[in-house]
Curated annotation (Swiss-Prot):
Protein's name according to its UniProt entry: U1-lycotoxin-Ls1g
Key words, A-Z: Disulfide bond, Secreted, Signal, Toxin
Organism classification: Eukaryota, Metazoa, Ecdysozoa, Arthropoda, Chelicerata
Cystine pairs: C51-C68, C58-C86, C70-C84
Gene Ontology cellular component terms for the protein in this record: extracellular region
Subcellular location: Secreted
Length: 107
């Protein structure tokens, strides 16, 4: 019986050591990933800013990523140009309103 306990303790020690090595490797990979994400986050376009040249570069809002919303602008000369800005689509606004209302009620 004593031999079985020693073998089980040895196996538990080996498994915990190998899993801690794996966790350390994962933490290093996550750190590199977070640093890369931070760099791309700095390049993101904030809400209400122009996104005409980068339509997929809008930031995240509270719950959803902002969408690049475009409109056609006609100048006094009659020239049409497309202007885009990062904003919250109406259905996302409705969802955020419902969630905010639910948080106030059930808080």
């Amino acid at each position: 019986m004593m031999k079985v306990l020693v073998v089980v303790a040895l196996l538990v020690t080996l498994i915990s050591y190998s899993s801690s090595e794996g966790i350390d490797d994962l933490e290093a990979d996550e750190l590199l990933s977070l640093m890369a994400n931070e760099q791309t986050r700095k390049e993101r376009i904030p809400k209400h800013h122009e996104c005409t040249s980068n339509k997929h570069g809008c930031c995240r809002g509270n719950f959803f990523k902002y969408k690049c919303q475009c409109t056609t602008v006609v100048t006094q000369d009659g020239e049409q140009t497309e202007r885009c800005f990062c904003g919250t689509p109406p259905h996302h606004k409705a969802a955020e309103l419902v969630v905010g209302f639910g948080k106030k009620i059930f808080g």
